[in-house]
């Protein structure tokens, strides 16, 4: 069971969002400018990365913590900090 939890603890969820751009920079939801390739911390436990496609469209990729199906007898614990250190981890009793 511990191997199953370990395997899935490294999977993340990414979402692409088309964003406005000005002077070759992504503009985030707080109107802050970010260079292409730059990553920044998002609200909660997430990370954003700015990139541009070959067509000149600007996007940021949102990377979030995985969702778990916690085995019986286990629970999730989160730690403060930046992504990915703040992601919840499955804690299971030793067998």
UniProtKB/Swiss-Prot annotation:
SMART domains membership: SVWC (SM01318)
Range of residues in the leader sequence: 1-24
GO molecular-function term, one example from the UniProt record: toxin activity
Modification comment: Contains 4 disulfide bonds.
One of the record's GO cellular component terms: extracellular region
Record's subcellular location: Secreted
InterPro entries per record: SVWC_dom
UniProtKB keywords: Disulfide bond, Secreted, Signal, Toxin
One Pfam family, short name: SVWC
Protein family (similarity comment): Belongs to the scoloptoxin-16 family.
Protein name (database record): U-scoloptoxin(16)-Er13a
Species whose genome carries this gene: Ethmostigmus rubripes (Giant centipede)
